[in-house]
């Protein structure tokens, strides 16, 4: 039986920062209601500054970790069938609806339009000028004028209900991600969500369960998994060049102080306000996703627990003191998020992954992106490698010498369009290729949940003075089965 989903139910641009400006902590539904009166609060980059600076931490973040054993028996009972290894249903043209047309969505539309076999049929943003600008891009690309939804903060529901949309792309502020992904799947649409896919552990479980029940894919669109260096290291790791894999590290260390206090860049304080609510790693996906791919997390190994520690929260307050005028709204905010969060993730095979997050102190951009095994190590920022027998005498080698290991996607698209060094286009191209050809996606809802779980769990660990927190087995045992991921084989069809 075919288990495809039914048809109807900092760094320079050469490497790319991977920064994705999407989008503050109440439930998503109440956030939607509250933001209705925020002037100029587009879904693309909404203000979301609804509470005071002392807004309470989400309840699910405070009680993020259930009392559970270390195996899959602790997971809630599966309500559907696994989505691991389930292909998309094949189609000649992929019809895309885009929700959120701010900094991220407004630029990503160009890449969807650049991929053959893709039509952008519907757009949604409460800021009408942004929607109109995006619609003009569609027409300029030679496609029919898309349907446009700008009525209010609930109009995205109409986009999701359309019968001519196959895939929904969500690029809104973080509060909206869960609700929009949920709505898309309930309307029979596959959905791709910018980082992070949700902010609460219970929401992650709900997305997993809903994906299984509806047979719709829900994916975290992690562009850094498609970086040129990341994909080269992935192929080398899976070919055994690093020996038996032991450890890795990833991060999102990106000085965002100026952008978070810029009244125009984010079109409101939503990004900064998260620093008044959670103490942990707010953005683990860029670092965790690629390393999880190296280690075959959810494909032979799994993340079991996380231990997190955080520094005092001083950087944003100091920046405000030195740069913001008296009377600025930011003076009402109290920052609690650690300037630097450091987490250690243990896997079922005993490997260790180090994660870092720092967006509020001065430092060069880095995602760390390292991998070590019994035969050597790779470290990024700057890129360097040391593996036996190629290197000796404690001298780093030139990573460029391993260009033959580049992934087929980078060999075919040597100079891809778009930002972040081309990884955005590679991601969109491959995603749309999988949808169009009816292939299994490179990553799925289980990866989305696993890569995002450090958000609430690091907060819980820091609050518990570094006590380890269990990472749920979102796959309910499917992780034990080896299966393909981002290290894909080139399909026979273009």
Curated annotation (Swiss-Prot):
Cofactor comment text: Binds 1 NAD(+) per subunit. The NAD(+) cannot dissociate.
Chain segments carrying region Disordered: 1-35, 59-86, 463-494
The protein's required cofactors: NAD(+)
Compositional bias ranges of the Basic and acidic residues kind: 12-22, 475-494
Residues engaged in binding substrate: 252, 271, 283-286, 365
Record has Oxidoreductase as a keyword: no
Keyword Hydrolase included in the entry's annotation: yes
PROSITE patterns the record matches: TAT (PS51318)
EC number assigned by the record: 3.2.1.-
PTM characteristics: Predicted to be exported by the Tat system. The position of the signal peptide cleavage has not been experimentally proven.
Keyword vocabulary terms for this entry: Glycosidase, Hydrolase, NAD, Signal
Entry binding sites for NAD(+): 103-104, 125, 174-177, 194-195, 223, 283
UniProt record similarity statement: Belongs to the Gfo/Idh/MocA family. Glycosyl hydrolase 109 subfamily.
Chain's role: Glycosidase.
Protein's name in the database: Glycosyl hydrolase family 109 protein
Organism: Streptomyces niveus (Streptomyces spheroides)
Lineage, top ranks: Bacteria, Bacillati, Actinomycetota, Actinomycetes, Kitasatosporales
